[in-house]
Amino acid sequence: MKELLYMELAEVYHRLESTTKRLEKTEILAELLRSVDKELLPDVTILMLGRVFPIWSEEELGVGIKLLMKAISLVVGVSMDEIEDEIREQGDIGLASEKLFSRKTQTTFFSQPLTVEFVYSRLKALASASGDRAQSKKINILVEVLSQAKPLEARYITRTVLEELRVGVAEGIIRDAIARAFEVDPALVERAHMLTNDLGMVAAVAREEGEPGLGRLNLEPGRPVKPMLAQLASSIESAITELGRAFCETKYDGIRVQIHRCGDEISIFTRRLENITAAVPEILEGVEEALPADDYIVEGEIIVTMDGRPASFQYILQRVRRKYDVERLTREVPLSLFLFDVLYHREPLIDEPLRHRREVLESILSEIPGRVEASRMVDVGPDNLNDALWLFEESIREGHEGIMIKDTEAPYIPGIRGKKMLKFKAEPETLDLIVVGGTYGRGKRAHLVGSYLLAARDEDSGDLVTVAHVATGLDDETLQQLSERMEKLAIERKGRKLLVRPEIILEVAYSEIVKSPEYESGYSLRFPVVKRIRDDLCLDDVDTVGRIESLFQSGQPDQPG
């Protein structure tokens, strides 16, 4: 196998970071992918996203900024305070590392140039470090890699460790680069990625097997896919008119899950593709009873009910985030599952119409009342519109969010927010935005972050662009918890203001979207209010500037949605 020096990869990162032009980025990436040996191609493709593992992998590097700073301190020979000062000045750990490494006088004797294979294998080893001395093992691995790094390499190694590459490359650009590099249909690349969630695999197949190979990639139990997403419906009547015939289902306010059975193993994934099987034993037990022992992928919503009504979303988060006291929480906060789709049963079903998929689901599901049930659904057309209106009113009366309105003839399209699936809620539409900064209060509230700077996602570059500040909707207990999290995520401070690593996602309601030069997105939210913390979402779930623009043009949220 031909070696690829990590410096060559770092120089590609630098070229990508130096241009904002999508076509130029695509060509730079295509050139790299063409030149890489087939054995390294999957790894390099994933590294281009600033990740070490596919998004659905359970493996995590488990390295926070403090641990990384300690490794840098050992390699460069400066104090933690000096590193913090440099990060504050540069506003980025990558640039700070590059500057610190450029001052390093001591070099490792007989050190060899870093290769991509070596760096990638050592970064993967971080995820395997466990036990009583896990932190020490991780530091040793980081020191081993960084002690051989040149300044530019240090910039991108440190960013990769924190999964913050900052070169303006999102999945869409990599898909285009794969298509260009190996002269295959971009639509086939997109579909293959949609079905596998693994661009490294897609790149390797495109290179070795071309379009026929891409066409053979398909859904597999055990490998989760991104969920199909819903657009806003301005009214029930307009939605039914547009679709002609639709399944209307109760919209449950819970955590959307994808449940996979492969052989004897059942795995339960959230919409951010996180495996939560161990945290929800009663759901695991329920699906073992309610579904056959065939390979399958089903989709549904987990909710908490108390006194016969849906409980707060935060109760569900409490369940899925806890790794300990699971047995006690199972008794105190019991969960229910409502299934509404099947993507695989003995064979892939996503290209089948929803009507057929629902029939399959109902044929294989043995409902367990109160534990595992099919979602409540009515088949609606222009001739029985009142059935949809009844379901909406009944769902709201019972404490649910509203209804889903789905085209009965639509295939399942992972990761796409299209017009074949609509939602209509009692409350106005909200946005899921990520916190990138904040401002501390004054006086008695000086220890609390009272205002949060929010960002949306640029779908082309993957960059985060600011869109609003929000300071209302959080009680004192939640403010305290968020402030503690912000402290741990802080990367830069200036007076009362701080910038943070983008990890906290907030669901935000607002009265209106307006154009504004104050924020990088070009838009702002009037009277934003935090509805809830969305720890069930990941960066890819953050709403895009394109969606904000679409809502602005449609004048939302004038109607409930």
Curated annotation (Swiss-Prot):
SUPFAM superfamilies: ATP-dependent DNA ligase DNA-binding domain, DNA ligase/mRNA capping enzyme, catalytic domain, Nucleic acid-binding proteins. GO terms for molecular function: ATP binding; DNA binding; DNA ligase (ATP) activity; metal ion binding. DNA ligase that seals nicks in double-stranded DNA during DNA replication, DNA recombination and DNA repair. Belongs to the ATP-dependent DNA ligase family. One of its GO terms (biological process) is DNA recombination. The lineage of its organism: Archaea, Methanobacteriati, Methanobacteriota, Methanomada group, Methanobacteria. Its EC number is 6.5.1.1. It catalyses: ATP + (deoxyribonucleotide)n-3'-hydroxyl + 5'-phospho-(deoxyribonucleotide)m = (deoxyribonucleotide)n+m + AMP + diphosphate. InterPro entries: ATP-dep_DNA_ligase, DNA_ligae_ATP-dep_bac/arc, DNA_ligase_ATP-dep, DNA_ligase_ATP-dep_C, DNA_ligase_ATP-dep_cent, DNA_ligase_ATP-dep_CS, DNA_ligase_ATP-dep_N, DNA_ligase_N_sf. The gene is lig. The keyword DNA repair applies. HAMAP family: DNA_ligase (MF_00407). Keywords: ATP-binding, Cell cycle, Cell division, DNA damage, DNA recombination, DNA repair, DNA replication, Ligase, Magnesium, Metal-binding, Nucleotide-binding. The active site is at K251 (n6-amp-lysine intermediate). The keyword Zinc does not apply. This is DNA ligase. Signal peptide: none annotated.
